[in-house]
């Protein structure tokens, strides 16, 4: 068994299974033996079986037949010989190795029945021969003869490739096709020969038209030329311009390289407008200014954007002193009235004897001829015929009104300005209009006061009434303090605006008479502790206020910054503090402390803010 396993492994290792196919054929031409295997009275039936194996140094008749096996049909034979038989075919599906071992056996069939295994009885074996041969693939038959001890066998064999297989080992597969997988035929050696219009290893690549660009074109069938994205033209050699490009070229897709004389993103701006359009008429000179613009320099006598208009030189009234103008080609002439001459009738032919100066002007003769008028201060002109307007140059600033007085000009200033030309803004804060330490900001004929805390009005002369908005809730009484409103709450309420009820909360917390439940006892204990805590807090607050009052009294007994001011105020200045008789302001660290002697009515007390100040 071990020998058989090793034999099988060796057989498999020698066989190179590939996609190949072929046929081994063997023909028995004659067989004779000295042994008698037939009865004398009749002919016998025999058949031949072959076993094709890989090449072995010592040929074993034992299976397996690694390359394949085959046998003839049952043949009729005479007493000791047999004539030729049909070929035995052994197909194989591997790469033909070129060497092989061959075992040929002759068997007695006992009867002419075909489908019966006569090899189970070794007594039916007539002869067996084994040989090792080298055989190349081809259609030619190899003749061979084998001489045994008592037999002679003549036979021939060959190996040829199956259809669609080629090569020395029948390992080259080539099947002609004309579909999506290829378009080719096969030559005698199994090489693919592409059909017309196809190329490539599998003849699956169509051959495009001869002028089709290899880089920018492609085809799906022979003779076509389809362009890739960004290219166009019959041969796909023209790049596609940027969309909207008018006068540009490209070397790569989506470019817009402007041609000479054109510019802009889309090459739609004519940079050489003069050459391309010649817009200037009448011999004018055209100059490109870029971005499709130009200017025309006109010849004398012409005007307009394109010099298309002929200018009448008389339109500008060049003739002076009442002369009449005559238009000429690119020129003019003046017909001067009596007493004037020159190109524009600008030269006066009159003399001082003609009394040419008006409005009191003085005439003086000139050595070169003619005269000159010396005008009085309020007139001007060659003959002092024009009245001089001294307000024409607008001498008054800041909206001042100019009044021409003849020899001079007068400026009437707007309210808030002064000066000969109204150039000075009057300082409206110079007279200190802001009261009660307010800060003044000058404006134009106006001022603005920034009032200190507790005062209001245009000049900060009015006390601010912080109680106008009625901030105190639940019947609280409002008092005006310089720091804002102060609320005196009625019993049962507390807070800066008397917004928190006090008695209602305590009534809800107090237990009803006659209830002795454990929860009531617990609430009573809590209320007792809370009452003790509140009493301690109230005592501390009262003690702190007394100390603060004493400290303020000590501070107000002194005069800070070496300044003491005593103000005796009447009732109308302090309507809210009627009985003040003396106020001492003391300045310390930017704060104001007030000490006052005051007689309070019965049942009334001072109110103090959280900072300790009088409210």
Curated annotation (Swiss-Prot):
The keyword Repeat applies. One of its GO terms (molecular function) is calcium ion binding. Residues 21-522 are extracellular. Coiled coil: none annotated. The keyword Protease does not apply. Residues 159-203 form the DSL domain. InterPro entries: DSL, EGF-like_Ca-bd_dom, EGF-like_CS, EGF-like_dom, EGF-type_Asp/Asn_hydroxyl_site, EGF_Ca-bd_CS, Growth_fac_rcpt_cys_sf, Notch_ligand_N. It holds the Pfam family hEGF. Residues 1-20 form the signal peptide. PROSITE patterns: ASX_HYDROXYL, DSL, EGF_1, EGF_2, EGF_3, EGF_CA. GO terms for cellular component: plasma membrane. Residues 204-237, 241-268, 270-308, 310-346, 348-385, 387-423, 425-461, 463-499 form the EGF-like domain. This is Delta-like protein B. It is found in: Membrane. Ubiquitinated by mib, leading to its endocytosis and subsequent degradation. Keywords: Calcium, Developmental protein, Differentiation, Disulfide bond, EGF-like domain, Glycoprotein, Membrane, Neurogenesis, Notch signaling pathway, Repeat, Signal, Transmembrane, Transmembrane helix, Ubl conjugation. The chain crosses the membrane at residues 523-543. Residues 544-615 are cytoplasmic.
């Amino acid at each position: 068994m071990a020998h058989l396993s090793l034999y099988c492994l060796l057989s498999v290792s020698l066989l190179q299974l590939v996609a190949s196919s072929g046929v081994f054929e063997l023909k028995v031409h004659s067989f004779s033996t000295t042994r008698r295997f037939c009865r004398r009275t009749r002919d016998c039936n025999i058949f031949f079986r072959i076993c094709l194996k890989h090449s072995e140094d010592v040929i074993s008749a034992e299976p397996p037949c690694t390359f394949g096996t085959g046998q003839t049909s049952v043949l009729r034979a005479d007493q000791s010989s047999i004539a030729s038989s049909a070929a035995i075919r052994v197909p194989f599906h591997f790469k033909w190795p070129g060497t092989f071992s061959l075992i040929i056996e002759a068997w007695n069939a006992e009867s002419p029945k075909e489908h019966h295994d006569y090899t189970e009885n070794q007594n039916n074996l007539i002869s067996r021969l084994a040989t090792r041969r080298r055989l190349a693939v081809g259609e030619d038959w190899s003749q061979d003869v084998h001489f045994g001890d008592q037999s002679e066998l003549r036979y021939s064999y060959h190996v040829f490739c199956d259809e669609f297989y080629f090569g020395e080992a029948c390992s080259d597969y080539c099947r002609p096709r004309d579909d999506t997988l290829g378009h080719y035929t096969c030559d005698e050696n199994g090489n693919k020969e592409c059909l017309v219009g196809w190329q490539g290893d599998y003849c699956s690549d169509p051959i495009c038209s001869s002028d089709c660009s290899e880089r920018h074109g492609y085809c799906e069938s022979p003779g076509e030329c389809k362009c890739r994205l960004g290219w166009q033209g019959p041969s796909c050699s023209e790049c596609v311009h940027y969309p909207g490009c008018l006068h540009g070229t490209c070397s790569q897709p989506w470019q817009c390289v402007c041609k000479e004389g054109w510019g802009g993103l889309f090459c739609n701006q004519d940079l050489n407008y003069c050459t391309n359009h010649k817009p200037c008429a009448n011999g004018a000179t055209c100059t490109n200014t870029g971005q499709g613009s130009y200017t025309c320099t006109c010849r004398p006598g012409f005007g307009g954007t394109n010099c298309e208009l002929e200018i009448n030189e008389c339109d500008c009234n060049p003739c002076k002193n009442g002369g009449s103008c005559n238009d000429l080609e690119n020129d003019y002439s003046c017909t001067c009235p009596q007493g004037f001459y020159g190109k524009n009738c600008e030269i006066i032919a009159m003399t001082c004897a003609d009394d040419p100066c008006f409005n009191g002007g003085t005439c003086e003769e000139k050595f070169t001829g003619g005269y000159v008028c010396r005008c009085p201060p309020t007139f001007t002109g060659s003959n002092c015929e024009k009245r001089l307007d001294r307000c024409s140059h607008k001498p008054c600033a800041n909206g001042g009104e100019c009044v021409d007085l003849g020899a001079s000009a007068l400026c009437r200033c707007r309210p808030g300005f002064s000066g000969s030309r109204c150039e000075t803004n009057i300082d409206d804060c110079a007279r200190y209009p802001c009261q009660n330490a307010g800060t003044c900001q000058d404006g134009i004929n106006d001022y603005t006061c920034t009032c200190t805390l507790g005062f209001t009005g245009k000049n900060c002369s009015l006390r601010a009434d912080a109680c106008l908005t009625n901030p105190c809730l639940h019947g609280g009484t409002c008092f005006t303090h310089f720091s804002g409103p102060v609320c005196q709450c009625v019993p049962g309420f507390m807070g800066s605006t008397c917004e928190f009820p006090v008695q209602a909360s305590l009534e809800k917390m107090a237990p009803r008479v006659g209830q002795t439940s454990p929860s009531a006892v617990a609430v009573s204990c809590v209320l007792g502790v809370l009452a003790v805590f509140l009493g301690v807090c109230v005592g501390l607050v009262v003690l702190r206020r007394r100390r603060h009052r004493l400290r303020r009294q000590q501070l107000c007994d002194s005069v800070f910054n070496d300044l003491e001011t005593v103000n005796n105020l009447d009732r109308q200045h302090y309507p809210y503090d009627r009985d003040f008789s003396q106020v001492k302001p003391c300045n310390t660290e930017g704060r104001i402390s007030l000490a006052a002697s005051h007689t309070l009515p019965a049942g009334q007390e001072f109110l103090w803010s959280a900072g300790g100040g009088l409210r």
